[in-house]
């Protein structure tokens, strides 16, 4: 077995990719650092893509050379045995350019995104027209920072510009300010321009499900640590695990099923039909579920999804009915919003197109800010863009890269997004936060701390017990001292076996207890 598992495997050598030098000195905003690994062989080393070149994320694993797996113990485990140096862990890394590149200096606003998408022109003229007689009330010019008013030469946010023209002064995203600012000439509203940008094929592609097709139907990376090697294969889904990660001493005889394929309550996999919980993603037998007849379901929630217990119902209802898309005002002119791709596919029902367009537009801005901070991160085996799929909460037929449970928290001031964090709320026990980043121009100003305080307050409102993060070894002390995180205790380590949490090579998981 040792001979087979080592055949074709080459020595991996890791090259350190430098972390961001612009960390918040005052709050020590931790920056996640990944390693760029290259597999060495007798073949020529493939060229590394220029950081400024747009890479093409491959969604079909079958396009890569065939990946033979060595299985043992009646096909219960798989061993990576690849000859091609472009496959495997070499694809997980940060391709960073110069941190002072122009895209990092652009304000993270919806207007800046519209300019970059060529939906509107920078310095293009906009106006507000009277609803009574159709006369022009105010004129302005589109800037990345906002709208330059022609009468007072002040740069205003779209909300402020609309209020300046005599409209409502509310900054609430549910107030149709963008719908009443028109582009001169075409007379299209700013809202129509945002909708047009979202409907562009490139933006629509960002929201697609990642269906991975391959000759081997099982994942090549462990769902718990994301590393290959000798893997236990679930007999019901694509998931694979290391024995050590699952705390299994011997390979199970007969059929073996992962935690996501067995009943959450009885731990069995049988012929009885099992439902999948809309919130935590775990399966369960109706007969095992307590108090099912006592539940009250909100029929306005799309798909009328079932839940495994009352705790998941409470978390889901609070998220989808009171938190997603709602702007929360903070001190000193800041606000924060919890975003998620708002469509029927992902179980969030929004009956107002205006709010949906605003949320989706902010997600587009948030993704670009996050990639400016971390670079483009690709999954080792499937080649998908991890950050993009996390921000857009894209689903997949591979559990390890199924990110449909993610939410994005954004911190804003003066119409600009200054900090972004990605969260996956599994249930009342565990929430993970694999990414958080501040805009380049707003670092060393405590932005991550502001957003972290808001996030933790909301998690306490949801009665969440623990917040889990992956950190590089170099940043663990910063997380501990500045944000109150600690190493995983034995109880949490056992709990995480039953969760699909995003993990990176060489990262260290930390936890913060939110509720005593």
Regions found by a protein language model. Give the residues of each.
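Eukaryotic, polar/proline-rich low-complexity intrinsically disordered regions
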Residues: 1-240, 244-247, 252, 260, ...
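PHD-type zinc finger and closely related Cys/His-rich zinc-binding mini-domains in nuclear regulators
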Residues: 105-108, 184-185, 189-360
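Conserved beta-strand elements of beta-rich interaction domains across eukaryotes
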Residues: 154, 168, 238-239, 263, ...
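Conserved catalytic-core motifs of GNAT/GCN5-like acyltransferases
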Residues: 294-295, 470, 484-505, 509
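A conserved beta-strand-loop-helix scaffold within acyl/acetyltransferase catalytic domains
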Residues: 355-441
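Conserved acetyl-CoA-binding loop-helix of GNAT-fold acetyltransferases
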Residues: 444-457
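Conserved GNAT acetyl-CoA-binding A-motif
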Residues: 457-473
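Conserved active-site tyrosine of GNAT-family acetyltransferases
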Residues: 478-482
